[in-house]
Amino acid sequence: GSGAGPAMMAAGGAMRMAGGPSRSTLPDEGLAPALDGATDWLNSTPLTAEQLRGKVVLVDFWTYSCINCLRTLPYVKAWAEKYRDQGLVVVGVHAPEFAFERKLSNVEKAVKDLGISYPVAVDNGYKIWRAFHNQYWPAHYFIDAQGRIRHHHFGEGGYAESERVIQQLLQEAGSKQVDQGLIDVQAQGVQQ
């Protein structure tokens, strides 16, 4: 076979919401699934729901040969850096589209070459993908400190809205020093 996983497709651009989200505009999309079933973890030991409770979590489903994923990566990396000390945990979930993306050494090289320092779950069995009922790369799920999904975004774009969601969830979690500014990423093509 081609090595393709379950009904997957890359998501393109997305609609933007005018203005930043307020408390009432962030729905409760249900309890986030545990990040169980990864075949390997890079940059971290396996993360459990218990370890993540009390933290705001951004789960980023990606694969290293997806151009849309690579274009969102500078934003995800910048958020991970900017908000780490305020309680944000970014977890990359690498779900392969092609057979060569299942090879751990290829994923390790991509993570190193792309400068990804946050935890990456290698989801070669699509267990995390299926638990989230995910269908797209890239896909971002924003999880509050109580472990509930409060926002999701598929594809490129929506960066200001996504960052406002992170800020709001950190404030809800009790972080007092949330920087209200937005990151300025000069993403020119693929970051290498």
Give a label for each model feature.
Residues 53-55, 85, 116-117, 134:
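Active-site acidic short loop of glycosyltransferases
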Residues 41, 62-65, 69, 79, ...:
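Signature tryptophan residues that serve as conserved aromatic anchors
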Residues 46-70, 76, 90-91:
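Short active-site neighborhood of thiol/selenol oxidoreductases, capturing the structured segment around
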Residues 172-192:
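PEST-like low-complexity, intrinsically disordered acidic/proline/serine-rich tracts
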Residues 8-50:
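N-terminal "domain-start" segment that seeds a small globular fold
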